[in-house]
């Protein structure tokens, strides 16, 4: 008879994780399950967060790929909110993400303070959210009021249709995940 008490704890954790992933894969449609690379999922999931000694805003300022986002956060007067008490999760579009947007749309968003605030707060959730841990799409509520979908699929970790980095940055008041496109809320 197999004795779990003699089985190493780390092996039990790994076995438990594999069992959880397998059960999630079996719960999916066959074509969806076939597209998830289990090795890549487990590898991405186990990448440790980079520790940053400052706030979300400090981390963004220290990241050259986020200079466009930083300038928009300053323009929207959101530095105080993103430097305050957390935890918050920010899905941070890179400079390349903003460069992919049509210039007219970026100009429109940047010139309207209310619209800019709506777009930026759509990238922020209260609490800890990790896009690497969701084989089944999971909804999270944004500070803007609408929801985002976090998932891990054949393309890796994603937020809505945007690809998220497997390596996040943990700050004193939350976590920052780089994403490859700007998320746009539904405008009513």
PLM regions with names:
Residues 1-11:
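N-terminal secretory signal peptides that target proteins for export/translocation
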